[in-house]
């Protein structure tokens, strides 16, 4: 009886009770007793703005700043303490009108710098409450770094360093190195791409790798994931970092090396390594690659909120989708990587500082033969890259393919003066050969080329088996294994993209008793959220409403 009764009183998203055809329902004495029991189950403690949670001063100041912004953008009804759920007419599109738009102050200084890309986590709009996410987007404030978030970052770094830590010999060499490393956006991206190349080689030599870059694009018009080439600026960059990639044997699911001596066997030459992988991987029928994410928890307890678990699985599915599409065609992946850089306002043809290149070679000598080829003007064996520099020479633009270096003549990548200015003998012995005029400059194009090729080596091995690993401290207490579902991913991506690109209204959590207690309690917008207030009001009125119905 109670189950039938509760089904009758399900709640719509707009919080109105479904009252159709209730007049035809007649209740006997047993029914009334069941109703009385049900009413005790749905009684909700009314929460008010006075029920303050214990917060640090920094957290409260952060929330106050957000609420001030949100009250201005989403003004509520006159004399109401609650804000509106409808964005103003000139800000209907969260991505184009707010997130990616740079805002200047009265003096022309940047007040909010727009971001012309989304992260995978930004697409998980229903991980918690989409209304909460909408307010966060429009507030344009960064996510508050609470203690558990900081602890999680430290734990992720520990896992990363366990596999990819910098060798002591590299640190010792760099301590004696005389020249500064460049740290601008161009060189940061060069470091990111180099590290990804290095880690993918480690995946094949040791059986696992961490913090692997991936990305894709979404068509903001159709709200669909793009599987081929990118057309224009309405195709939005989506970036992601994969916590854990494992090469495993299909019989025991344990990490398995393809070739432990991968670098040594191929003369520490990336060109030969990629050729070796291309020949060897098709024969490795007993090996697969699993994509996974790492979640850190304060205690050894797996999340029990269905929306949180679902979003975590979707996150890994996005990563799996991106790797598959980047691996289908290295030439298209190469163009997507170059576009990735330009979307970040980075000049893909800015030469990379020799100090950074030396640091890269110290970490992984496998790139050294490639840099020697570039220096001598020889092909590296990847047609789009080689074709670009060949066409520059054929068009008579030899003097313009490099930007001016810090030391050397304008329009040249000429490092000759470094030979005279470098005092450390160990540096000259190892890298003095690079202190000359280069035929071609080393740029981000090189790292994009090799990374695109390595993405291609992953494709034949990608498994539909995905995983989420739960840690508390250094202890992995649970691994949630599940299957890749491309249909579900595309469906969920379409829905979240419709929200981001202003094609549908925000969809808050369903206002059930459990949701209002668990989701709303720690929400930054708890005190100004009309959706929460209406939900609580509805439950408070539910008892009298049912009593009236029972009298029919």
Swiss-Prot record:
Subcellular location, principal: mitochondrion
RNA-binding as UniProt keyword: no
Molecular function per GO: 4 iron, 4 sulfur cluster binding; DNA binding; metal ion binding; single-stranded DNA 5'-3' DNA exonuclease activity
Keyword list, A-Z: 4Fe-4S, DNA-binding, Exonuclease, Hydrolase, Iron, Iron-sulfur, Magnesium, Metal-binding, Mitochondrion, Nuclease, Transit peptide
GO cellular component: mitochondrion; nucleus
Family: Belongs to the EXO5 family.
Essential cofactor(s): Mg(2+); [4Fe-4S] cluster
Cofactor comment: Binds 1 [4Fe-4S] cluster.
Subunit structure: Monomer.
Record field: transmembrane: none
Role: Single strand DNA specific 5' exonuclease involved in mitochondrial DNA replication and recombination. Releases dinucleotides as main products of catalysis. Has the capacity to slide across 5'double-stranded DNA or 5'RNA sequences and resumes cutting two nucleotides downstream of the double-stranded-to-single-stranded junction or RNA-to-DNA junction, respectively.
Location of the protein in the cell: Mitochondrion
One GO process term, biological-process aspect: interstrand cross-link repair
Enzyme class of the recorded protein, top EC level: hydrolase
Taxonomic source organism: Kluyveromyces lactis (strain ATCC 8585 / CBS 2359 / DSM 70799 / NBRC 1267 / NRRL Y-1140 / WM37) (Yeast)
E.C. no: 3.1.-.-
Protein name: Exonuclease V, mitochondrial
Highest rank taxon of the organism: Eukaryota
Record: residues binding [4Fe-4S] cluster: 129, 520, 523, 529
């Amino acid at each position: 009886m109670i189950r039938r009764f509760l089904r009758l009183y399900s709640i719509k998203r707009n919080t109105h009770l479904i009252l159709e055809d209730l007049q035809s329902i007649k209740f006997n004495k047993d029914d009334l007793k069941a109703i009385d029991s049900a009413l005790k189950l749905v009684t909700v403690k009314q929460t008010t703005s006075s029920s303050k949670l214990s917060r640090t001063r920094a957290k409260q100041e952060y929330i106050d700043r957000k609420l001030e912004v949100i009250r201005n953008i989403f003004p509520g009804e006159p004399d109401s303490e609650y804000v509106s759920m409808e964005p103003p007419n000139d800000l209907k599109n969260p991505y184009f009108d707010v997130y990616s738009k740079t805002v200047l102050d009265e003096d022309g200084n940047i007040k909010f710098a727009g971001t012309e890309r989304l992260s995978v986590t930004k697409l998980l709009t229903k991980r918690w409450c989409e209304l909460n996410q909408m307010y966060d987007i429009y507030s344009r404030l960064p996510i508050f770094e609470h203690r558990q978030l900081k602890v999680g970052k430290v734990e992720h770094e520990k896992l990363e360093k366990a596999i990819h830590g910098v060798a002591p010999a590299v640190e010792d060499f760099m301590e004696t190195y005389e020249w500064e490393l460049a740290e601008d956006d161009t060189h940061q991206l060069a470091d990111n791409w180099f590290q990804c190349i290095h880690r993918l080689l480690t995946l094949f030599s040791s059986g696992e790798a961490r913090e692997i870059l991936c990305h894709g694009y979404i068509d903001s018009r159709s709200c669909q994931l793009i599987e081929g080439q990118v057309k224009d600026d309405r195709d939005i960059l989506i970036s992601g970092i994969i916590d854990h990639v494992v090469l495993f044997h299909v019989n025991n699911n344990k990490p398995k090396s393809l070739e432990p001596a991968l670098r040594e066997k191929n003369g520490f030459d990336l060109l030969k390594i990629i050729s070796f992988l291309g020949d060897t991987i098709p024969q490795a029928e007993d090996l697969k690659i699993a994509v996974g994410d790492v979640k850190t928890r304060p205690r050894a307890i797996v999340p029990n909120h269905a929306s949180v678990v679902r979003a975590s699985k979707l996150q890994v599915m996005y990563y799996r989708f991106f790797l598959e599409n980047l691996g289908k065609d290295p030439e298209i992946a190469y163009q997507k990587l170059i576009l990735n850089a330009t979307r970040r306002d980075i000049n893909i043809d800015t030469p990379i500082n020799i100090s950074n290149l030396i640091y890269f070679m110290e970490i992984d000598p496998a790139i050294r033969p490639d840099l020697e080829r570039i220096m001598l003007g020889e092909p590296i064996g990847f047609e789009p890259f080689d074709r670009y520099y060949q066409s520059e020479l054929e068009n008579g633009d030899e003097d313009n393919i490099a930007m001016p270096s810090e030391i050397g003549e304008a329009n040249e990548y000429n490092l000759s003066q470094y030979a005279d200015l470098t005092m450390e003998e160990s540096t000259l012995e190892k890298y003095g050969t690079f202190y000359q005029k280069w035929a071609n400059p080393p740029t981000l194009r090189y790292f994009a080329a090799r990374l695109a090729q390595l993405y291609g080596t992953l494709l034949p091995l990608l498994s539909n088996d995905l995983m989420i690993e739960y840690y508390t401290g250094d202890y992995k207490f649970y691994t949630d294994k599940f299957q890749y579902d491309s249909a579900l991913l595309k469906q969920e991506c379409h829905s979240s993209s419709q929200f981001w690109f202003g094609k549908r209204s925000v969809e808050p959590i369903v206002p059930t008793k459990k949701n209002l207690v668990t989701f709303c309690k720690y929400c930054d917008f708890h005190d100004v959220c009309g959706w929460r207030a209406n939900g609580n009001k509805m439950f408070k009125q539910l008892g009298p409403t049912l009593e009236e119905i029972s009298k029919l």
